[in-house]
């Protein structure tokens, strides 16, 4: 266990009471950290900022625990140090680590450039997700036979019970598709996405 991230992406930007909620985030963190330290004084505690882990201006006190790490997220934008300026500036102002807990796929070139920028600025990173059903991940999942029927049912109109019944596929078919999907998710059955892995500066085997 690396540590505990208290809340993932707290306080969306579209809430009408966003300023009021932002003001409550740090006090909530302090109460949670205090409770954790009653049973665990060892592990790091990761604190995500408001508005998709991006707004660190809501934090004013970093001195209440000696094992805090801040965590940011970013999807899209320029692959430059300027794009990360607010994260870097906050990190430097509190003299505590900043960890990019989520960053999403763009092009392989963008991904490689952004990784280099983060590493040059001493920001640890995790690209998200590790595996999914296409090639924008490290490990691709093969789609099983009849998976399209599962998807079609999940996307079908369901305003009434009649619509749900009409869209419902054969249960034996979709059950087998789900079981096959679970097997395909096993790491030994996934497909390494070589270009993606290499763009992260890692060796694909």
Question: Model regions: which residues?
Answer:
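Extracellular glycoside hydrolase catalytic/binding regions
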Residues: 1-132, 137-151
């Amino acid at each position: 266990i690396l540590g505990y991230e208290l809340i993932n992406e707290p306080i969306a930007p579209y809430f009408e009471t966003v300023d009021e909620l932002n003001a409550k985030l740090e006090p909530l963190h302090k109460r949670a950290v205090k409770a954790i330290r009653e049973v665990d004084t060892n592990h790091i505690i990761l604190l995500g900022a408001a508005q998709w882990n991006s707004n660190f201006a809501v934090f004013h006190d970093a001195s209440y625990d000696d094992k805090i790490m801040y965590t940011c997220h970013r999807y899209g934008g320029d692959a430059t140090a300027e794009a990360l300026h607010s994260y870097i500036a906050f990190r430097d102002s509190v003299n505590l680590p900043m960890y990019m807990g989520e960053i999403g796929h763009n092009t392989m070139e963008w991904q490689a450039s952004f990784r280099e920028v983060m590493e040059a600025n001493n920001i640890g990173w995790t690209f998200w997700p590790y595996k999914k059903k296409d090639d924008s991940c490290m490990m691709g999942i093969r789609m099983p036979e009849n998976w399209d029927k599962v998807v079609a049912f999940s996307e079908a109109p369901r305003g009434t019970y009649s619509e749900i019944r009409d869209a419902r596929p054969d249960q034996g078919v979709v059950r087998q598709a789900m079981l096959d999907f679970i097997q395909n998710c096993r790491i030994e059955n996934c497909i390494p996405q070589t270009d993606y892995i290499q763009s992260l500066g890692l060796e694909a085997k």
